[in-house]
UniProtKB/Swiss-Prot annotation:
InterPro entries: EF-hand-dom_pair, EF_Hand_1_Ca_BS, EF_hand_dom, Myosin_RLC. It comes from Mizuhopecten yessoensis (Japanese scallop). Residues 15-50, 84-119 form the EF-hand domain. The keyword Metal-binding applies. Gene3D superfamilies: EF-hand. This is Myosin regulatory light chain, striated adductor muscle. Keywords: Calcium, Metal-binding, Motor protein, Muscle protein, Myosin, Repeat.
Length: 156
């Protein structure tokens, strides 16, 4: 597995590896070089979620062993290459949708994008949400993922 995982390092652009390193560092709250259940719980709580033990275990099961940076890169490299399925994108938004309304406050989403991870600029934000389905300040992520993935399905 390590051989396959280290091959990821040669496939990804240096900038992307650096961004992933920053993301990993944010998630590795206790700074031990591995992401564990406590790290996932802490980062989730910082994002306003309180996942239960079962959810945290499911997240960690994606890795075939301890989740160090190389394994983290390996797992997420496919996602970085733009191969996320519509369902994967929808599930990513759903993590922030505790009431399961299929809609999120647009200001909350913009705040996340401006202040975490990629740090979107105002221009990037405008382009991203130019055609986004927003009604009454609520961002419809089901319609949005259908739009960007081209399925044409408006309902899940």
């Amino acid at each position: 597995a390590d051989k396959a995982a280290s091959g990821v390092l040669t496939k990804l652009p240096q900038k992307q590896i650096q961004e992933m390193k920053e993301a990993f560092s944010m998630i590795d709250v206790d700074r031990d070089g591995f992401v564990n259940k406590d790290d996932l719980k802490a980062i989730s709580e910082q994002l306003g979620r309180t996942p239960d033990d079962k959810e945290l275990t499911a997240m960690l099961k994606e890795a075939p062993g301890p989740l160090n940076f190389t394994m983290f890169l390996s797992i997420f490299s496919d996602k970085l290459s733009g191969t996320d399925t519509e369902e994967t994108l929808r599930n990513a938004f759903a993590m922030f949708d505790e009431l399961d309304t299929k809609k999120l406050n647009i200001e909350y989403i913009k705040d996340l994008l401006e202040n975490m991870g990629d740090n979107f600029t105002k221009d990037e934000m405008r382009m991203t949400f130019k055609e986004a389905p927003v009604t009454g300040g609520k961002f419809d992520y089901v319609k949005f993922t259908a739009m960007i993935k081209g399925s044409g399905e408006e309902e899940a």
